[in-house]
Amino acid sequence: MAGITSSTVGFNAVFTGITKTVSSHSLFSVDSKLCSLRLSKTELSFTNLTPSPRRAFAVTCRFGGGGGGYRFSGDNRRGRPKEAEIDEALDISSIRSATVRLIDGQQNMLGLVSKDEAVRMADDAELDLVILSPDADPPVVKMMDYSKYRYEQQKRKKDQQKKTTRMDLKELKMGYNIDQHDYSVRLRAAQKFLQDGDKVKVIVSMKGRENEFRNIAIELLRRFQTEIGELATEESKNFRDRNMFIILVPNKEMIRKPQEPPTRKKKKTAENEASASAAEITAEPEPEPEPEPEPEPEPEPEPEPEPLQIDS
């Protein structure tokens, strides 16, 4: 926008027999949305000046607003942008504990160090000190390039959003007389595509006299779908043309289940059960203790024979 850059305004002043010093003072300073006007005069010293001297004032008028200056009440201009708020993950001052558990940039656990020592080590390595677990006792912090870490997190999040909103169509081609190895390769590729959330189109091309083996091609496609199992459902198929195909759509419920990692406790219990069962199989049965022999009854004493009496 056009504006007045500078102009000179004169005035007459009468000074007689006095000494007067005029300090530098801004007579008028206004900043608005449309115009910024500043009127000022420099420091002057007059001693016994003759009447009617001409002094010059510099008037600068500029359109387009600007920073600083006086703001009228009701002026809704946007102020200067505030400093970026500190990310909570970088706010080390929020840690009340004097010690922290430190992890370096190479994923090595350095153990317990003082908070000041952790800050110093991060500064020496020219890395950011990021809070991983603020509620732990003591809190866990890590040295890393936080801007790079956030970029990778945002990129990973965008990729996940793309997968949820967009579904690509992957094509797999094979002949009716494909060998077992090539068939297994295509089967694994289809399983991977389906787990990534993409559709899979399996095509069997029939050329020339191969059309006579149409039934074999149909059985091959049915076998392929059967071995995919519950990982996908059939969306459409075409067994009439020379290029026969079947389109499989991923089953979201079956895809989510493998992504849930088993907890350590479950893994340990499974290992314990397996080891216990193996021990039961390999362990020999302990011999039963032999019964103790019953004590034999003591023989009763024989009665003494009565003495014979002989009559004389």
From Swiss-Prot:
- What family name appears in the similarity comment? Belongs to the IF-3 family.
State the protein's name: Translation initiation factor IF3-2, chloroplastic
Name the encoding gene, please: IF3-2
- The answer to whether keyword Protein biosynthesis applies is yes
* InterPro entries assigned to the protein according to its UniProt record, in alphabetical order: T_IF-3_C_sf, T_IF-3_N_sf, Translation_initiation_fac3_CS, Translation_initiation_fac_3, Translation_initiation_fac_3_C, Translation_initiation_fac_3_N
| Keywords attached to this entry | Chloroplast, Initiation factor, Plastid, Protein biosynthesis, Transit peptide
**Bias kind Basic and acidic residues: ranges:** 253-263
**Which is an annotated GO molecular function term of this record?**
translation initiation factor activity
Q: Where is the composition biased (Low complexity)?
A: 272-282
Biased segments, Acidic residues type: 283-305
Per the record, what is one GO cellular component? chloroplast
Q: Which NCBIfam families does the protein's record reference? A: infC
> Subunit info?
Monomer.
Name the Pfam families for this protein: IF3_C, IF3_N
Residues of the region (Disordered) are: 253-312
Q: Which domain of life is it from?
A: Eukaryota
This chain's function reads: Chloroplast translation initiation factor that is essential for the coordination of leaf and chloroplast development. IF-3 binds to the 30S ribosomal subunit and shifts the equilibrium between 70S ribosomes and their 50S and 30S subunits in favor of the free subunits, thus enhancing the availability of 30S subunits on which protein synthesis initiation begins.
Tissues expressing this chain: Highly expressed in young, newly emerged leaves.
Q: Which organism is it from?
A: Arabidopsis thaliana
Which HAMAP family does the UniProt entry name for this protein? IF_3
Q: Without the gene, what phenotype results?
A: Chloroplast development defect, and leaf developmental abnormalities, such as virescent and serrated leaf phenotype, disorganized mesophyll cells, and altered cotyledon venation patterns.
Q: Name one GO biological process term.
A: leaf development
